[in-house]
Amino acid sequence: MRAAVLRSYGDPLAVEEVSDPEPDPDGAVVRVDACGVCRSDWHAWKGHGEWADNRVPTGQVLGHEPAGEVIAVGDRVDRFAVGDPVVVPFSLGDGTCSYCRRGHGNVCADGRALGFGPDAPGAFAERVAVPTADYNLVSRPDWLSARDAAALGCRYMTAYHALAERAGLDGGDWLAVHGCGGVGLSAVQLGSALGATVVAVDVDDGALSRAAAIGADHTVDPGALAGTDDTVPDRLRELRDGGVDVSMDALGIAETCRNSVRSVRPRGTHVQVGLTTDAERGEVSLPTDWMTRWEVSFVGSRGMPPTNYDDLFSLIEASDVDPGALVSRELALSEVSERLAAMGEYDVRGVEVVTEFDR
């Protein structure tokens, strides 16, 4: 089968023939009909993560936002059969550890990350193997196309887990989203659907326009504050006296992280979703005394447990959230490298999805 393989950090992925995957006795193989291209793929492509012992090795097939159809199952799989439409989460649990048993498979003690390690080849490929299929595979509703499910990918589910499950966002809350790429725009849509007043923060006019079109009640451009005495936290406190209830850093650079923390009200919550770059190397200094004084919570959030997808699907079906509305471009497998490079220049708008795997 054709797959896009990381051979050298920062160089074009090698689109080459690799062996077809075979299902484990408790696993499945999925034909990939669509796979999103995510900033986490960019981090992997650049070789980031060395500082956290989390660097993706060369030789890896990247891609972690697939949707498609089951084409083979092992003899110990009970819940899925050939022909079933599915979504494949990138956080793959073993289904048996204490975290998985409590519904936290995204932090499984023996978990795998699809597309980020040799034990889980990714989905920039025609087919992908899924271990422990009964636990990890997610049935895809009839109303959700593979393309739109790939847009859901790790963006909507990451945003949903961060807002609804980690930060406890409620109807009537104020939410600030710092960084309006794929995850950030998903958070804007979902925050609005959950009943929050949403403020989108980004330096790009196009990103802010898109955020306003899909649910942001207010927008803030940090660049427009240059040369003034105002800061992003100041502006957010003007909009919502005392600060917002929940603030998300969806980008990961030091400035957005600190701005997000400083934007919340007393006893508010900052949720960290964006991963750092070479500049931060996993470390950002924070106003810890101020956070202690005002009992500000800082929570990390990674992906979403595979067992929680039905809650997200129910919210999408019951609201006007449209994952497909964020798809800005459909790609061929051979175009992935070019689009990863564009991410380094912050020249990607919305969500880009691979839908052609034969070129």
Kindly label every feature range from the protein language model.
Residues 230-233, 237, 241, 279-329, ...:
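C-terminal substrate-binding/catalytic core of Rossmann-like NAD(P)-dependent dehydrogenases/reductases
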Residues 1-65, 126-128, 358-359:
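Short N-terminal strand-loop motif that marks the start
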Residues 175, 271, 321-327, 338-359:
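C-terminal capping/lid region of NAD(P)-dependent oxidoreductase domains
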Residues 94-178:
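NAD(P)H dinucleotide-binding glycine-rich loop of Rossmann-like/cofactor-binding domains
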Residues 85, 142-225:
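Mid-domain Rossmann-like dinucleotide-binding core that forms the NAD(H)/NADP(H) cofactor-binding site
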Residues 85, 174, 268-269, 297:
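Short glycine-centered segments of the SAM/dcSAM-binding site in methyltransferase folds
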Residues 264-265:
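Helix-to-beta-strand junctions that scaffold the AdoMet/dcAdoMet cofactor pocket
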Residues 21-35, 50-101, 121, 141-143:
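Glycine-rich beta-strand-centered segment in the early N-terminal region that forms part
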